Swiss-Prot record:
Entry's transmembrane regions: none
Known EC number: 5.3.1.26
Assigned protein family: Belongs to the LacAB/RpiB family.
Pathway: Carbohydrate metabolism; D-galactose 6-phosphate degradation; D-tagatose 6-phosphate from D-galactose 6-phosphate: step 1/1
Name this polypeptide is given: Galactose-6-phosphate isomerase subunit LacB
GO BP term, example: galactose catabolic process
Keywords: Isomerase, Lactose metabolism
């Protein structure tokens, strides 16, 4: 399995540690940068990770910036990417099992590198649970990648809200 990994200059040391961890576990790592502490911008590297995963060059991706918010927003702009910003295993596993997330994002100044490595390993090992409900919500999310008239309809997500109100979703 090949994992694409990218970061901004704030967390290059964390990315290197995570990359070393993944390599030690036997994963191929595609490091898309940045490679030093020279000021740069996280969208560049979020986009690179997203493109590597969306094209099939990598199976999964890891994005890291200071808070994780910026790089995760950037990677999610790449069509075909479903990235989750996480800082715990429960969220990471949920993202993979229910939403078939293919990228995971972290705040390198928020989540310690050892916890990050444990979360990444759990994310990699988790399997997407393919069922009609999960496929339906993923299709709805994916449909947002293209600008379609029905997205402007204030009732676009009503079906899911109605199901929530009926108690069909459990937290």
């Amino acid at each position: 399995m090949k994992i694409a990994i990218g970061c901004d200059h704030i967390v290059t040391d964390t990315k290197i540690a995570v990359s070393d961890f993944l390599k030690a576990k036997g994963y191929d790592v595609l490091d898309v940068g940045t490679y030093d502490f020279t000021r740069t911008h996280y969208p560049i590297f979020g986009k690179k990770v997203g493109e590597a995963v969306a094209s099939g060059e990598a199976d999964l991706g890891v994005c890291i910036c200071g808070t994780g918010v910026g790089i995760n927003n950037a990677v999610n702009k790449v069509p075909g990417i479903r990235s989750a910003l996480v800082r715990d295993m429960t969220t990471a596993i949920y993202a993979k099992e229910q939403l078939n997330a293919n990228v995971i994002g972290f705040g390198g100044k928020i989540t310690g590198e050892f916890l990050m490595c444990d979360i990444i390993e759990a994310f990699i090992k988790a399997d997407y649970i393919e069922n009609e409900e999960n496929k339906k919500i993923i299709n709805k999310i994916n449909s947002l990648e293209e600008n379609k008239p029905e997205q402007n309809d204030i009732h676009f997500f009503d079906e899911f809200l109605e199901r929530w109100n009926r108690g069909e979703y459990k937290d």
